Amino acid sequence: MADIFDLFRKISKESASAAPISHIIVGLGNPGIRYQWTRHNAGFLAMDAITAKYGGNPERAKFNALVGETTIAGKRVLLMKPQTFMNHSGDAVEAAMSFYKLTPAQLLVISDDISLDVGKLRVRKSGSAGGQKGLNSIIESLGTQDFARIRVGVGQKPSPDYDLADWVLSVFSPEQREHLQKNSFPYVVAGVEKILAGDLDGAMQHCNGKGGI
């Protein structure tokens, strides 16, 4: 009997793997080891937390991005880390969405947010880029603001005259990295699950304001 159940599970897994891509999740960041732990790479780091649970680590080069595939909440998902550098992220996202013939309603973007304390989350259905260059590039490429996003707080500049580029390209402290892993990214993963299950309002209720130091 156990063999029969194992066979059903194998068939189910293979069927899910063969299903067409129905959603794209994009983690925003900059490519290269020098940027790995920077604030601007919070989207890449959150993506790593997703793949730690679901697999599909983005390793294959396509669409000017590293991509992988997995299944979350019964949906076949393309996971993307654009390799265009932040300001041109929209080029990679638009190419993937065009290839799979998806709409903005099937897109979820995870990015950093300097207006939020480190780790604090904000889920939104749509809206402006709020000064985030990667989000702005995606909005310009798609011609719409109407796509879901999860914003991960990376902290405000230490002072008003502190250079913004220097701030977002500064690295998280070891304590901040540990906090993100333990207290913030689990909420990100749960939010992704709810959004892909069609419960974006539930994701907002579950995640917004959570995860901060």
Language-model segment annotations:
Residues 129:
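Conserved TIR/SEFIR loop-to-helix hotspot centered on a Trp-containing motif
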Residues 160-178:
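Short, electropositive alpha-helical surface patch
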Residues 2-126, 136-151, 157-163, 182, ...:
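Nucleotide and nucleotide-moiety/phosphate-recognizing core
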